Each structure stands twice: as C-alpha cells, then as structure tokens.
C-alpha cells in the first residue's frame, strides 16, 4: 500500500499524495506518468500506526497486509484532489516509468481477523486531513 499523511515531503520522487496536493495548492500542474489508469491502495498514516500498535500487542509473529483494500487510479486521485482544492486545470502526462506496476491493492482480511484492525480513514477523510495540514 501507499502510506500518506501530514508531514510527507511534497518535493521528493515518492509520495504522490503529497506531491499532487502541494502542486495543486500552489496552482501548479501535476505530472502523471503513464496514462493515469495505474491503481494504488492509499492508506492513511494514522491507520498504519493503529495497525502497528495492535500488532505489537500480540506475541504472534504475524505477516499482515496493511491497506484499505480499495484501488484508486492516479487519474481518480487527481480528480478528487482537484475538486477538494478547487483546481480547474488539467494534469500533464509524461511517459510511464519503467517497471511501474499497473495495479497494486492489498487484501487486509488477515489484519482484520488476527489483530482486529481495519482502516478508519477513507480516502475522502484522509485527503481532507492532508489538505488541512498543507493549509497551515
């Protein structure tokens, strides 16, 4: 999964949530590599912290997927962020990066059943938190 949330550097190579949020809030055009149909499982950082705490409370050595189980395309992400930030431009498209996965989504059923974890933040609420942090 792709973890996102406040304090993530918007100027790096990774962290598309922060990169896009930073650009859109500065009225800059985000660059999408490839056609934007590639999907990711975006999980809010506090959900990951919650999963780590719950997993530390067991003596079992567990291998768990921590994600939302929801696929969101890069195009969808830019569209949602654009609406939330009231940015009315169009993203720039660049050639896809070599080796990039087309789809990435995690099945979190074992985390739910073995440590009682499930994500509390939806993409919508997580993005609201991220935008709020960027606005400060």
List PLM regions with ranges.
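C-terminal substrate-binding subdomain of Rossmann-fold SDR/epimerase-dehydratase oxidoreductases
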Residues: 2-6, 22-136
């Amino acid at each position: 999964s792709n973890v996102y949330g406040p304090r993530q550097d918007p100027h790096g190579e990774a962290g598309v949530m922060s990169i896009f949020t930073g650009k859109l809030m500065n009225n800059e055009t985000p660059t999408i590599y490839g056609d934007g149909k590639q999907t990711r499982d975006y999980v809010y950082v506090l959900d990951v912290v919650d999963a780590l705490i719950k997993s530390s409370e067991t003596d079992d050595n567990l291998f768990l997927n921590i994600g939302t189980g929801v696929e969101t395309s890069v195009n969808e992400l830019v569209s949602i962020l654009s609406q939330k930030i009231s940015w009315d431009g169009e993203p720039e498209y660049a050639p896809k990066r070599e080796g990039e996965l087309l789809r990435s989504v995690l099945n979190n059923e074992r985390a739910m059943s073995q440590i009682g974890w499930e994500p509390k933040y939806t993409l919508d609420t997580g993005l609201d938190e991220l935008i709020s942090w960027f606005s400060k």
